[in-house]
């Protein structure tokens, strides 16, 4: 009897419904090819949820997501909700669903597609063959540590305080995700910290080394964050999988992303210890082109591939989707954001049709 996966779809706002439609179509195709099935159920989040219910994350959406095998999100936000109080904006729905699902590990790949290599701001010989996965701790560190705030000292001077703190449990669980991720890739993990000056980073390094004992097949190295940032630009091919804390990961994942030259091609995943993961493209909702069939659906398709690989344990189906994306680029099809001389401009729907045609031939 074939496996059926329950997947919550969160099309969200802007171009979200358009790119989600492409992802659903290609997922259905690879499911047929590999002998499993999907039960897709849509739910509201972000601006669409605010308009319908007054809340960026309705309770019904979170409940449905918790009962799913995986959650696939498209895009959140737009100009229409920019004047709302910060706590009521669409983006708070994303933070709330991450918290509600207990997601603490953010996986951000940065892969150079040979057909798009000239979009990178770095020289071809530097970025050719780059394939990096940044595993960022998502719920701890300086963004969440306490005490925090702006206080007045005894002399009347204002003082801003944030606290970078990690527990052993928080470090151990992100380290395990990173080692498991590296094991599924090329077996190399670089832990990034600032252990030469920060006590919290010394604990980080100690715990990562302790967890490494359980992963003898993964080669572990360490870099200080300033050197890691430099090496990402100087010699990015040396990296396979990187694991780091929330603040450092926030910065390094964006550096790694821009090696590729096109944010419209970048997927991501957020995972927890158990329960469903959340899979979404890195790009925004692009309200300026929404409903015009101009959106690039490839990051959404690659997010669906990450869902297959890291959320549903269907690595062969994930490979198939990723290969289809490479093939469609090889054939010269481009949406406007990645268009270059000698390539063919297509819309979102046609890009999806080309992917389906390629999958039929694979």
UniProtKB/Swiss-Prot annotation:
One of its GO terms (cellular component) is cytosol. Its cofactor is Mg(2+); Mn(2+). The record marks 143, 194 as: Important for catalysis. It catalyses: (2R,3S)-3-isopropylmalate + NAD(+) = 4-methyl-2-oxopentanoate + CO2 + NADH. It is found in: Cytoplasm. Pathway: Amino-acid biosynthesis; L-leucine biosynthesis; L-leucine from 3-methyl-2-oxobutanoate: step 3/4. Its EC number is 1.1.1.85. GO terms for biological process: L-leucine biosynthetic process. Binds 1 Mg(2+) or Mn(2+) ion per subunit. It is an enzyme of class 1 (oxidoreductase). The keyword Ion transport does not apply. SUPFAM superfamilies: Isocitrate/Isopropylmalate dehydrogenase-like (SSF53659). The keyword Kinase does not apply. NAD(+) binds at residues 78-91, 284-296. GO terms for molecular function: 3-isopropylmalate dehydrogenase activity; magnesium ion binding; NAD binding. Gene3D superfamilies: Isopropylmalate Dehydrogenase. It comes from the Bacteria. Substrate binds at residues 98, 108, 136, 226. Belongs to the isocitrate and isopropylmalate dehydrogenases family. LeuB type 1 subfamily. Catalyzes the oxidation of 3-carboxy-2-hydroxy-4-methylpentanoate (3-isopropylmalate) to 3-carboxy-4-methyl-2-oxopentanoate. The product decarboxylates to 4-methyl-2 oxopentanoate. Homodimer. This is 3-isopropylmalate dehydrogenase. It comes from Synechocystis sp. (strain ATCC 27184 / PCC 6803 / Kazusa). The gene is leuB.
């Amino acid at each position: 009897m074939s496996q059926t996966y329950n997947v919550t779809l969160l099309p969200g706002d802007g171009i979200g419904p358009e790119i989600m439609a492409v992802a659903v179509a290609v997922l259905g195709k690879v499911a047929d090819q590999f002998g499993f099935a999907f039960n897709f159920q849509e739910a509201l989040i972000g601006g669409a949820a605010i308009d319908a219910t007054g809340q960026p994350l309705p309770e019904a959406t979170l409940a449905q997501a918790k009962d799913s095998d995986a959650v696939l999100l498209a895009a959140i936000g737009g100009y229409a909700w920019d004047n709302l109080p910060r706590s009521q904006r669409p983006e708070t729905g994303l933070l709330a669903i991450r918290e509600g699902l207990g997601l603490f590990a953010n996986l951000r790949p940065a892969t150079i597609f040979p057909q798009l290599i000239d979009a990178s701001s770095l020289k071809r010989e530097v970025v050719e063959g780059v394939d990096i996965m940044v595993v960022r701790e998502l719920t701890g560190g300086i963004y969440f540590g306490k005490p925090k705030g702006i206080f007045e000292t005894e002399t009347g001077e204002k003082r801003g305080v944030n606290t970078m703190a990690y527990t052993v449990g928080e470090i151990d669980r992100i380290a395990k995700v990173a080692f498991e991720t590296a094991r599924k890739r090329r077996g190399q993990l670089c832990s990034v910290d600032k252990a030469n000056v920060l006590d919290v980073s010394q604990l980080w390094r100690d715990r990562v080394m302790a967890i490494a004992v359980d992963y003898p097949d993964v080669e572990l190295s360490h870099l200080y964050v300033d050197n890691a940032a430099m090496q990402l630009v100087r010699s990015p091919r040396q990296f396979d999988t990187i694991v780091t804390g929330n603040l450092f990961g926030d910065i390094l994942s964006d550096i790694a992303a821009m090696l590729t030259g096109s944010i419209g091609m970048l997927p991501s995943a957020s995972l927890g210890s158990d329960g469903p993961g959340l899979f979404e493209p890195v790009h925004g909702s692009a309200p300026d082109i929404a409903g015009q069939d101009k959106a690039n659906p490839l990051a959404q398709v690659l997010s669906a591939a990450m869902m297959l690989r890291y959320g549903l344990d269907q690595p062969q189906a994930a490979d198939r989707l990723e290969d289809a994306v490479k093939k469609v680029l090889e054939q010269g099809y481009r949406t406007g954001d990645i268009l270059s001389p000698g390539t063919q401009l297509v819309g979102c729907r046609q890009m999806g049709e080309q992917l389906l045609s390629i999958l039929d031939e694979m």
